[in-house]
Amino acid sequence: MSQEKQVFSIDLAGRQLTVETGQLAKQANGAVLVRYGDTAVLSTATASKEAKNVDFFPLTVNYEERLYAVGKIPGGFIKREGRPSEKAILASRLIDRPIRPLFADGFRNEVQVVSIVMSVDQDCSSEMAAMLGSSLALSISDIPFEGPIAGATVGRINGEFVINPTVEQQEQSDIHLVVAGTKDAINMVEAGADQVPEETMLEAIMFGHDEIKRLIAFQEEIVQAVGKEKSEVKLYEVDADLNQAVREMAEKDMHSAIQVHEKHAREDAINEVKKRVIEHYEAQEADADTLGQVNEILYKIVKEEVRRLITVEKIRPDGRKGDEIRPLASEVGILSRTHGSGLFTRGQTQALSICTLGALGDVQILDGLGVEESKRFMHHYNFPSFSVGETRPMRGPGRREIGHGALGERALEPVIPSEKDFPYTVRLVSEVLESNGSTSQASICGSTLAMMDAGVPLKAPVAGIAMGLVKSGEHYTILTDIQGMEDHLGDMDFKVAGTAHGVTALQMDIKIDGLSREILEEALQQAKVGRMHILDHMLSVIAEPRTELSAYAPKIITMTINPDKIRDVIGPSGKQINKIIEETGVKIDIEQDGTVFISSINQEMNDKAKKIIEDIVREVQVGEIYEGKVKRVEKFGAFVELFSGKDGLVHISELALERVGKVEDVVKIGDVITVKVIEIDKQGRVNLSRKVLLKEEQEKEAAKEENKQEQQ
């Protein structure tokens, strides 16, 4: 095919989307430059010529952010991009999930898809441009990809659905949905919503699919014009005779092993069957390739038998019915010194979530390509190896942990009270202590319990549940509360979180070509029933958020000052505010509108800091009377401190009724005297008088004496 530059365009949500091929990255198997508005993303696809000796499909998807895309130079000592941001990792997962199911089973060549964000227009999503670019790079390449796919962002404003909403529209939208799929079916959903009914979410998904069909037709035109012929790749297959022999040896025993209800006992039973078969072939001195094939066949036997039991015999590995939820157990307040804690257990899945409250100055500062500069609500998810009874090096969070943490954050954020109603930064950490499926949803339930225990006034409690699907031809079974084996061997992982009023988050990944509207609708309704059951259980443990915060949580008071006085509170180079912090031990956060947040564990220190700030911003008015301390004495008068940071001068002529020859004859440093403000000059200097008050007192006494004499 021609390597000349070619340009293709389509209108997308009122903005032009352009695809350029044949000019950049021509040594990649496939490469396109996608321009959407002023957003520009270069997407490339490359593949190894030979299959890798692994038992999985080695696909890597990278979404690379470059700060030059928004005209920024990276901060810090090393002026170049470091590890991927959380947003970049989530975008990589977003692109990976819809394209992964569209490679043939048995394809083992290594494939790498890279999207580099080169220019960002905030109203034109770089993630959606990268998703379309990744699909196109694969589709026009010689890599055997069974796409194309496309994605669309859907919002809803005043009841009307909007495709790829602008930043302004997103702020008004109660749905933030990313949907991807082929022209025939949906195969990926990622959504956050403000307690939206299931029926509305389904309509939003189908609305997005209509746009996907149009974008796929556009891609097909490009593939027709510039696409390469797909290379023929030998798919991995096991030897037919070996396959039959292993099945005859293992199928009957595996059928029994799979139906052991307890997870570890079931794994032991399955491993015992595998061990017996492997030892049989090792005794025959089988080579590594043969043993690898034996393992592959044994895996397929387990997968096929689990799926057959579910779809044909309607039996789940642990004996539950299709819509049955595992036993639930919850507890709150199990960690004394934390601000709030919640333990949620569902079968052999257990999550301990901890809520920490901080001042608004504890927000997470964001330095990426987005418009957001900070984040006051965070949810972090940890998955230690002991949760599945394994040993593994303890490293930082991987893509999975970041993805699960973000899903929980998205599910809970709609019910977090506003900064005005609850001026705290909220951080949640979910520690997965046991894992047998649905840990991300357990972390959502545990986090809700932890926040209620901490006294966070949630708009409504949130629960989450993971749904599964096993599909064989036209027959399918939808599973509620899937466990690890059902997730691993099934066709769908569909996570739904929400309140009693509606959905707050959705995430769907599937391993087959796509799902019909009917299956999606049934899964959503079945998930709602399960979610309500879990919510009832959680509310039986703690019915509403505690009315008082933990004794160890910071106390926050709010005050408002004149914005013109902010600089007085801060002082030159922060001298004044640092002095207050040092003196009281509080944290102080000041908004541009003059709102001041003072926080510390000690309420007395909060009040002290508030008094100091009130004194700093306080306006002195002519005619006001103060009781102040003499701070300095000069020949011409005495300087009196009216309140912290504000002095005035009592001229020697205003000290007493009689003539004063020497200031020290009337007052000395440290004396407390009552004075009246008689003038504020053009330079803001305050002139005080003691004499005026003495005269007023003298006149009152004289009037009293006169009245007394008249009465006699």
UniProtKB/Swiss-Prot annotation:
PROSITE patterns hit by this protein: KH_TYPE_1 (PS50084), S1 (PS50126)
Signal peptide: none
UniProt superkingdom: Bacteria
GO molecular function: 3'-5'-RNA exonuclease activity; magnesium ion binding; polyribonucleotide nucleotidyltransferase activity; RNA binding
Keyword Nucleotidyltransferase recorded: yes
Domain KH per the UniProt entry, residue ranges: 554-613
Any one of the GO BP annotations: RNA processing
Keyword Cytoplasm in record: yes
CDD domains for the chain: KH-I_PNPase, RNase_PH_PNPase_1, RNase_PH_PNPase_2, S1_PNPase
Cofactor: Mg(2+)
Positions contributing to Mg(2+) binding: D487, D493
Similarity-based family: Belongs to the polyribonucleotide nucleotidyltransferase family.
PANTHER family: POLYRIBONUCLEOTIDE NUCLEOTIDYLTRANSFERASE, POLYRIBONUCLEOTIDE NUCLEOTIDYLTRANSFERASE 1, MITOCHONDRIAL
Name assigned to this protein: Polyribonucleotide nucleotidyltransferase
Organism for this UniProt entry: Bacillus cereus (strain AH187)
Name of the encoding gene: pnp
